[in-house]
Curated annotation (Swiss-Prot):
Family: Belongs to the DEFL family.
Organism of derivation: Arabidopsis thaliana
PANTHER family assigned to the protein according to its UniProt record, in alphabetical order: DEFENSIN-LIKE (DEFL) FAMILY PROTEIN-RELATED, DEFENSIN-LIKE PROTEIN 22-RELATED
One GO BP annotation of this record: defense response to fungus
Protein name: Putative defensin-like protein 26
InterPro entries: Defensin-like_20-28
Length: 81
């Protein structure tokens, strides 16, 4: 009976940390999809847009790729949703 209580408690702890981790990822912008990524660098040419699309295609699980998004401080690579 004691081992069942220990197992239940351990499972509860694991599930709690899993949920906290998922919430932290969503709030911190951990997802690559649907976000702009300045670390890719500025996009200026058609070649950069193709490179951005390939980079996003490999980095996001939805397989949709990305595009060059014009912004006030220069273009950035943005993942499709």
């Amino acid at each position: 009976m004691a081992s069942l209580k220990v197992f239940s408690f351990a499972l509860l702890i694991v599930l709690t940390f899993s949920v906290i981790g998922m919430i932290y990822n969503v709030e911190s912008g951990g997802s690559l999809c649907c976000n702009s990524h300045p670390k890719f660098g500025k996009c200026n040419t058609n070649n950069d847009e193709q490179r951005c699309n390939r980079w996003c295609h490999n980095g996001c699980g939805n397989g949709k790729g990305g595009y060059y998004k014009s912004m006030s401080h220069g273009g950035q690579c943005h993942y499709y949703c």
